[in-house]
Structures are given as structure tokens and as C-alpha cells.
């Protein structure tokens, strides 16, 4: 079980809301979010309701302002607790519909370009565990939660292009 607390103001001030499960609409609990405390679990925060918009991956720790989680604004409107998995495995494809060259991955990758000579990923399959895909190397830029399923094109994971810079396994000790 996870636990996350949202605060309207920076440095854990102002009205707060504690959450322990997925919530598709946080708007009724607070109007803005400027700081977050994650007591347990790994979470994906979303800029808009129903798990839409920019995504932000947070693990256990304190985030005194939204820049700490690479946020673009103080808008957090939904959140999802990411289930813990023991093992991780995924396949990256250079073309849509799982075609073209395939690379398999079971560990974090700080630079997809250096490791696989790819700057774009057009489809992928998450076989085990949850992952976060970052648009830039070294775990920077836009973030996308990847859960076990098939993604036949980059739009399936919520991206507007096929840019893929790095991948990180979602790992947390509850």
C-alpha cells in the first residue's frame, strides 16, 4: 500500500490531502499543488484529470516545490499508485506494430541512443514490471508510465512523438 500527501503551498504548507490509492480526479481536494510528500510506494502524478496530460514519476521522498519533480506548473489533477513488481522486462521496436529491429531490456538505461543506437522508439511491449520512459537521456524531459501491455505506436503511451532518451524501472521497497 502506498501513501502520498499533496500540499497546496510550497514547503508542505497550506491545505493538504492524503491519498493511498489511484485517484482519477483530485480537483475536489485541492486547487493547486506546490509540494508533495511520498511516504511509501511509487506514484505517477498527472497534470489533468483521468490520468491525462504531463506525467511526473515520484518515489519515496519529499518534494518541497513542483520543480523538484520536474513539473511545468502547480497543476496536479490525478494520481496513480504504481504496483510493485519483482522483475522487469520490455522490448523496444524501431517501427510501429512491433516491427523492425527489436531490443530487449531488463535494467535501467540512461541513454537509449548510446546503448541501442536509436533516438526514436515507435512501439514497445512491456512484458514484466512497470517502467518510466523519459524523452531525453539521463532521465530528463517528459515522462511516460509504461505498464505491462503492448504499445503499438508512441501515441499509445501518451506521447506526441517517438523521442525516447532513457528508461527506468519502477522499483521501490514498500
UniProtKB/Swiss-Prot annotation:
Keywords, sorted A to Z: Eye lens protein, Methylation, Repeat
Pfam families with a match to the protein in the record: Crystall
In-chain residues carrying the UniProt-annotated modification S-methylcysteine: 23
GO biological process: camera-type eye development; eye development
Chain positions covered by the region annotation Connecting peptide: 84-87
Family label: Belongs to the beta/gamma-crystallin family.
PANTHER family, per the entry: BETA/GAMMA CRYSTALLIN, GAMMA-CRYSTALLIN C
Function as written in the Swiss-Prot or TrEMBL entry: Crystallins are the dominant structural components of the vertebrate eye lens.
Further comment: There are six different gamma crystallins identified in mouse lens.
Protein name: Gamma-crystallin C
The organism of origin for this protein: Mus musculus (Mouse)
